[in-house]
């Protein structure tokens, strides 16, 4: 029976070694699984953080874009209001009563006489008769709302006192105050 005992001892040792190896493998597998799960949690957390950051940036871009769109729309509507206001001034000047227009033209002629005592005067066709007694030779018609253009005898000096050019000068220099009145100070 000596051989049986040796075989049994070898088998017992093999089973014990097998159990040890299995236990070690199971412990190693558990450790690998635990490590993999921890790494997976870190990866998921990092990806979630990246996704949140991307969403936050996207929201910020959308908000900035919306604010810019609102600002553009506001500026466009203000531009439209200013254009309508300008057109209202043009309409008012175009429809001045004849007496008022004659008075304004006389004042403009008087102003022009300071710089050009003699020369030619130009007006729109409707106002030609209002400047016949101006002391200037009538030079013809110009396309304008009203007012006068005076040219020296030699043609070297021109004065543009048309309502159009006066309005544009006043409009340009008064743009900020007009905007402040219409839209409030910014």
UniProtKB/Swiss-Prot annotation:
GO terms (molecular function) for this protein are:
ATP binding; proton-transporting ATP synthase activity, rotational mechanism; proton-transporting ATPase activity, rotational mechanism
Look up the coiled coil feature and give its residue ranges.
none
**The keyword Cell membrane is assigned to this record:** yes
Give the GO biological process terms.
proton motive force-driven plasma membrane ATP synthesis
Principal cellular location given in the protein's record: membrane
Q: Where in the cell is it found?
A: Cell membrane
Topology in membrane: Peripheral membrane protein
What keywords were assigned to this record?
ATP synthesis, Cell membrane, Hydrogen ion transport, Ion transport, Membrane, Transport
List GO terms (cellular component aspect).
plasma membrane; proton-transporting two-sector ATPase complex, catalytic domain
Q: Which Pfam families match?
A: vATP-synt_E (PF01991)
Q: What does this protein do?
A: Component of the A-type ATP synthase that produces ATP from ADP in the presence of a proton gradient across the membrane.
Q: State the oligomer form and interacting partners.
A: Has multiple subunits with at least A(3), B(3), C, D, E, F, H, I and proteolipid K(x).
What does the similarity note say? Belongs to the V-ATPase E subunit family.
Q: What is this protein called?
A: A-type ATP synthase subunit E
Annotated source species = Methanocella arvoryzae (strain DSM 22066 / NBRC 105507 / MRE50)
């Amino acid at each position: 029976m000596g051989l049986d005992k040796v075989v049994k001892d070898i088998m017992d040792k093999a089973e014990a070694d097998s159990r040890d190896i299995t236990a070690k493998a199971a412990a190693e597998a558990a450790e690998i699984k635990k490590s993999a799960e921890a790494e997976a949690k870190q990866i998921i957390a990092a990806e979630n953080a990246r996704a949140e950051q991307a969403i936050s940036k996207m929201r910020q871009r959308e908000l900035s874009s919306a604010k810019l769109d609102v600002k553009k729309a506001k500026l466009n509507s203000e531009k439209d209001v200013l254009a309508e206001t300008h057109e209202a001034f043009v309409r008012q000047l175009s429809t001045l009563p004849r007496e008022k227009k004659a008075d304004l033209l006389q004042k403009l002629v008087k102003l022009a006489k300071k710089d050009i005592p003699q020369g030619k005067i130009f007006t729109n066709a409707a106002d030609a008769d209002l400047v016949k007694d101006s002391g200037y030779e009538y030079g013809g018609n110009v396309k304008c709302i009203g007012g006068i253009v005076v040219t020296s005898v030699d043609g070297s000096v021109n004065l543009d006192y048309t309502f159009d050019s006066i309005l544009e000068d006043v409009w340009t220099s008064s743009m900020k105050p007009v905007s402040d009145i219409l839209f409030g100070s910014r």
